[in-house]
């Protein structure tokens, strides 16, 4: 399969998976808070990833500097970014939170230019402008619509900024490590530990509620 076709397949698969994942998050939000949902997801996925890495381990994968970069990405992405994404779905609903989360290319362009020295072409800049225009349309709110509040719009936008910052650290870490499998494992583990530790600082009602069986389904 050609690289372009393979890239398209991965992009479409990611979009389908994200949509299905968001629906499950919306359903799970009825039984637990956002922090619980993210922590359960990390608890479920990290051990199998670690087992595969252990089974396929190569000596050249040991790189503390790469692990530090990936851990920073794990704090921003799987921990902070995903919690805010779950919260956005709860407060704004799936049909608003998901399109706003799609503003990630906007922040990716900003971070790519500012931190990585990338120079996007006119097509990328035009696409970014369309994203901004779409966000303006999505956030239009009729006066009689009481199902959501504009004061919650910061949640998905800050979450997207966290994910975009995570991508910068992820890119730097993967380039040093040259193993996407190890990278996602380190990020997931770091995100799980950071989220568990930081959740102790949250109000009681926002802390992980792992004792609710329906939240795990």
Placement of each model-derived feature along the sequence:
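Hydrophobic core positions of alpha-helical segments in small-molecule transporters
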Residues: 40-41, 100-103, 122-126, 158, ...
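Residues that mark transmembrane-helix kinks and helix-interface sites
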Residues: 18-23, 78-86, 109, 132, ...
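Hydrophobic transmembrane alpha-helices of multi-pass small-molecule transport proteins
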Residues: 111-113, 123-142
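A helix-boundary/kink motif common to multi-pass secondary transporters
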Residues: 33-34, 93-94, 120, 178-179
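Hydrophobic alpha-helical transmembrane segments in multi-pass integral membrane proteins
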Residues: 49-59, 107-124, 161-178
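Alpha-helical transmembrane segments of compact multi-pass small-molecule transporters, enriched
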Residues: 44-49, 100-114, 129, 190-194
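Hydrophobic/aromatic residues within transmembrane alpha-helices
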Residues: 28, 37, 88, 114-120, ...
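Membrane-interface interhelical linkers
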Residues: 1-36, 40-72, 82-92, 140-157, ...
């Amino acid at each position: 399969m050609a690289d372009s076709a393979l890239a398209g397949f991965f992009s479409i698969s990611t979009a389908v998976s994200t949509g299905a994942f968001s629906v499950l998050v919306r359903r799970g939000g009825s039984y637990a808070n956002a922090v619980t949902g993210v922590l359960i997801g990390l608890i479920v996925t990290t051990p199998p990833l670690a087992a595969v890495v252990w089974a396929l381990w190569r000596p050249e994968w040991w790189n503390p500097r790469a692990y530090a970069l990936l851990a920073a990405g794990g704090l921003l992405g799987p921990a902070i970014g995903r919690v805010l994404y779950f919260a956005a779905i709860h407060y704004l609903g799936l049909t608003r939170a998901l399109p706003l989360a799609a503003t990630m290319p906007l922040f990716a362009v900003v971070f790519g230019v500012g931190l990585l020295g990338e120079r996007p072409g006119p097509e990328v800049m035009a696409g970014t402008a369309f994203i901004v225009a779409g966000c303006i349309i999505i956030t239009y709110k009729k006066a009689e619509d009481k199902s959501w509040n504009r004061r919650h719009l910061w949640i998905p936008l800050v979450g997207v900024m966290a994910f975009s910052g995570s991508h910068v650290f992820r890119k730097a870490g993967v380039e040093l490590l040259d193993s996407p499998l190890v990278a996602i494992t380190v990020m997931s583990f770091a995100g799980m530990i950071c989220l568990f530790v930081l959740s102790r600082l949250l109000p009681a009602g926002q802390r992980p509620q792992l004792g609710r069986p329906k939240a795990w389904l």
